[in-house]
């Protein structure tokens, strides 16, 4: 029987209290690369969440049968298989988004969040709790991605999901798009500001000297 309190903890904890990007500072590279548009940030969130959840589930199912000496290889094989499935589905049903995400879907296998949860949680916990932990961490990762993607697309081009929200001066509107938001360094600074804001609200997350 799944532990309801544990499921609630692993599902909701990563959203704010133990966010994989804001607190653990994991998965930052892809957060910089795929957040120029809200659409790609959302698709990447779904992809990482599915891979993390199902890899946790399958690894947890066979955790008692994996020799310690090859556990990392087994984990990577399971994660890589799921990444290939996600990549092929995107190419089949969302080809344009797949092209925009480029190699970053394939690089989910190297995402520290996916490997970290497999090793730290799935290898020690039952399947249902592990699955929910994967969903929680995927959503925690996604919250930051979506916020960054929202800000970058809105202020960088005046659009959301490719739809004009703030008409640019060139098209007779009032808004002057800020191209700096479309450059990778802007994502770095936005994530830094989000981390600062979160740790201001939750002082317990600040590391002691």
Swiss-Prot record:
Topology term for the membrane: Multi-pass membrane protein
Major enzyme class: translocase
GO CC entries: plasma membrane
Pfam family, one: Rnf-Nqr
Single GO biological process annotation from the record: sodium ion transport
Main location group: membrane
GO molecular function: oxidoreductase activity, acting on NAD(P)H, quinone or similar compound as acceptor
Catalytic reactions of this protein: a ubiquinone + n Na(+)(in) + NADH + H(+) = a ubiquinol + n Na(+)(out) + NAD(+)
Localization per Swiss-Prot or TrEMBL: Cell inner membrane
Coiled coil: none
Its EC number(s): 7.2.1.1
Transmembrane segments: 42-62, 66-86, 103-123, 131-151, 178-198
InterPro entries from the UniProt entry: NqrD (IPR011292), NqrDE/RnfAE (IPR003667)
UniProt keyword list: Cell inner membrane, Cell membrane, Ion transport, Membrane, NAD, Sodium, Sodium transport, Translocase, Transmembrane, Transmembrane helix, Transport, Ubiquinone
Domain of life: Bacteria
Protein task: NQR complex catalyzes the reduction of ubiquinone-1 to ubiquinol by two successive reactions, coupled with the transport of Na(+) ions from the cytoplasm to the periplasm. NqrA to NqrE are probably involved in the second step, the conversion of ubisemiquinone to ubiquinol.
Known partners and oligomeric status: Composed of six subunits; NqrA, NqrB, NqrC, NqrD, NqrE and NqrF.
PANTHER family: ELECTRON TRANSPORT COMPLEX PROTEIN RNFE, NA(+)-TRANSLOCATING NADH-QUINONE REDUCTASE SUBUNIT D
Membership in a protein family: Belongs to the NqrDE/RnfAE family.
Protein name: Na(+)-translocating NADH-quinone reductase subunit D
Organism: Proteus mirabilis (strain HI4320)
């Amino acid at each position: 029987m799944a532990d309801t309190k544990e499921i609630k903890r692993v599902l909701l904890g990563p959203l704010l209290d133990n966010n994989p990007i804001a607190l653990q500072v994991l998965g930052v590279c892809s957060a910089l690369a795929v957040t120029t548009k809200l659409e790609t940030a959302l698709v990447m969130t779904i992809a990482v969440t599915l891979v993390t959840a199902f890899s946790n589930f399958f690894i947890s199912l066979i955790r008692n049968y994996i020799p310690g000496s090859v556990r990392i290889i087994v984990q990577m094989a399971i994660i890589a298989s799921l990444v290939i499935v996600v990549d092929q589905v995107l190419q089949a049903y969302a080809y344009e988004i797949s092209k925009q995400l480029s190699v970053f879907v394939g690089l989910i296998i190297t995402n520290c969040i996916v490997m970290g949860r497999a090793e730290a949680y799935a290898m020690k916990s039952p399947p249902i709790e592990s699955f929910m932990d994967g969903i929680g961490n995927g959503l925690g990762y996604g919250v930051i991605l979506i916020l960054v993607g929202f800000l970058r697309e809105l202020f960088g081009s005046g659009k959301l999901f490719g739809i004009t929200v703030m008409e640019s001066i060139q098209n007779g509107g009032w808004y002057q798009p800020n191209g700096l938001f479309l450059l990778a360094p802007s994502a770095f600074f936005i994530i830094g500001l989000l981390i600062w804001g979160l740790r201001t609200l939750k002082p317990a997350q600040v590391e002691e000297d």
